[in-house]
Amino acid sequence: MPHGEKLYEGKAKILYATEDPTLVIQYFKDDATAFNAQKRGTIMDKGVCNNRISSALFTYLEGRGVRTHFVKQIDDRSMLVRRLTIVPLEVTIRNITAGGMAKLLGIEEGMVLKRPVFEWHYKSDALGDPLINDDHILTMDWATAEELAHIRSESFKVNDALKAFFNERQIDLVDFKLEFGRCPSRGTPPSAGSATGMPRPQAEAVSTTILLGDEISPDTMRLWEHGTRRKLDKDRFRRDLGSVEEAYQEVLRRVLGEAHQASGASR
């Protein structure tokens, strides 16, 4: 599918315009970053793995009532998605202690939590994606109370679905991050600036629908092999554990093993 001008290039993806102003092409790169881009590298075919994994998981979630920006997979590195105005927040859901939570609370990694922990983070590399709460968000007009309630509900729905999905594949879903965006309900596409993936300073007053955006991949999830706790995600890059490409390929193999059977065919 031919693409138009580059709208935005981030650390892991590029967004391109299409002939339809309501749709963009999301292209996955092999570039890898960690610690808010302080560490950089390349993971061979990471873009291919993440695009295919995300396509399968978005399709799976759509089949379970989660509305996403995903339209279809175009090729090995690209997917067609709805054009969103990204809410300047990242959601993190934690099922097992690891990473930032273990460091913040001074506890060991690997403790299974008695209930999932939900976190809001302000989407800002410069500030290190700080942990925030509802009051910060509402005071800064980053989202409305109704939007926050919807995002929270959808995030837990995603967690339930993905935990079941990966459990069947002998993988523990340790934690993951999600991003959401606004899709105009009246057929008017977002302005060019808002389609870049950069956050808006305020919530828009127009009628919109909140959709799950970005990607769902080993870049955005912590995945441990059940029983061994072997890391199958970007922590292998962050912590110089080696075998990074093999871990991504292993997740792809397990995801595609049954994803298409569960959802029919890839859209």
Describe the predicted segments one by one:
Residues 189-204, 267:
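Short Gly/Ser/Thr- and charged-rich N-terminal loops/segments
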Residues 111-128, 159-172, 216-221:
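Phosphate-binding core of ATP-grasp and ATP-grasp-like enzymes
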Residues 38-48, 131-154:
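Short histidine-centered catalytic/ligand-binding loop motif
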Residues 142-174:
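A long amphipathic alpha-helix within ATP-dependent nucleotide-binding catalytic cores
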Residues 93, 173-184, 208-214:
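Conserved metal-phosphate-binding beta-hairpin within the catalytic cores
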Residues 216-260, 264-267:
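C-terminal helix-cap and adjacent tail motif
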Residues 72-77, 166-183:
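A short glycine-rich, hydrophobically flanked beta-strand micro-motif that places a catalytic Asp/Glu
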Residues 2-122, 255:
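Active-site loop/lid in soluble adenylation, ligation, and acyl-transfer enzymes
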